[in-house]
């Protein structure tokens, strides 16, 4: 049995010096941890180093929780490898070479004296080797569940730390969650916003780098959108330099609101229910320390994108494409499938004054002169995972996006007919955060469908206006012919007029005090194609924040706003909560959605 007296657990997120290793929590729902990633773009990253104490002399088994990330696609030796050393002496095992799944890889025995010691993790390639935790134990059995080990071997509090009670709890800090939090706060609610990243903005942050799309200040409620204009980036573009996305402006917008308490770097991992249909609070786990906090509230909103809060609370959710029999949508498949819009893994190169080398890899996708992409930037159409589970296989999807980017760039630089043109180009940035478009969607009291949009069926509770096509991505036909797993996409675009989304799509049918805003609202797969762009999501959040504050003022539930108080919400939507006198910057990526346009499908 592993105890504190015979075992030492060293989570990578708690290392004294992480060196060049990145702590990434985006897969915590599945792997139960943040991963430490050597994301050096082909150049080994600086060592991660930590100290630890041993109580008594002894021989310890060394285990590392890791995975072989290229194993799903290549039987060549993986590049995701690293070494582990104790007190300056590395063990013989090369880590990261085992299973494609997270597992404990054995590193042999280490003799340790009582007292202080140092452990070092040395990356070998810069190609995304990864680990979670390192375990030194005198127990001879293989380690088990990582969450149980943390609870037994780390000095974690046994009870979540109480962070108080709030009028409105926002889970998710993309533009939808930000607007929901700020809107409610400005109207008088005490708000908590919980965000598992260290930055705000979601897909529009410097971690993912998707430019804002769609229109603000349109439709019946033309004041909706001034709020996003206050903190949205002034410049357009996908896969640009980090400064374009103005993370500091977004952080400042949240910090400026005295009614908002921000919990960044916390992921909601459990819920506290009052009966089967009412949320009373959430348990959030620090993505570095694994300490838990408790946040109680009256009204909640799921702005996670993945419907994480709703799923924990037991709300009904869907993923994939509904069959034609469900809503009689003309573009729906005959039978339900798990196909979703994909995730983009973006990248770019930069021109240098001197030639720059890039490894000639043998473990990558087989690229040739016919399939190589002659480009210095991979943006939205570098899209993967349409046939995979966007939750359970999220890491595999992200990894495949990186795998093909490395493969294409290596061939382009070292073998292609264009290689002389690329001699001075350096592979400068590759996102390790998947830019998701779709995963789980929650059910509200109304599900918006393709028919509503095409037939322009207007409902009395219309609120936020769409401003995008029905933009349903598919694998690029030529790419799909050549590769078992396509990695380029195209858009199948259906022209639309601006359409007012029913308010009933923004609150949950099962959890009576929960709103939704963003890409996990109550729509069909096809309808998601127009509501999912970020400026539309932001206005959804703004409306949800207004409605949440009305719930506080009136002592009611989200459903009651629709049934009994929609006129009050309408008055708020006419006013908006943003400042209309600020310079108007959101004039880019505005498209004519009524025009016929093709993206090569």
Model-derived regions: residue spans:
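Flavin (FAD/FMN)-binding glycine-rich loop and adjacent Rossmann-like elements that form
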Residues: 157-159, 203, 265-268, 275, ...
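Beta1/beta-strand and adjacent pyrophosphate-binding region of the FAD-binding site
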Residues: 162-174
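N-terminal Rossmann-fold NAD(P) dinucleotide-binding loop
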Residues: 177
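Conserved N-terminal/central alpha/beta ligand/cofactor-binding core
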Residues: 183, 189-190, 195-272, 277, ...
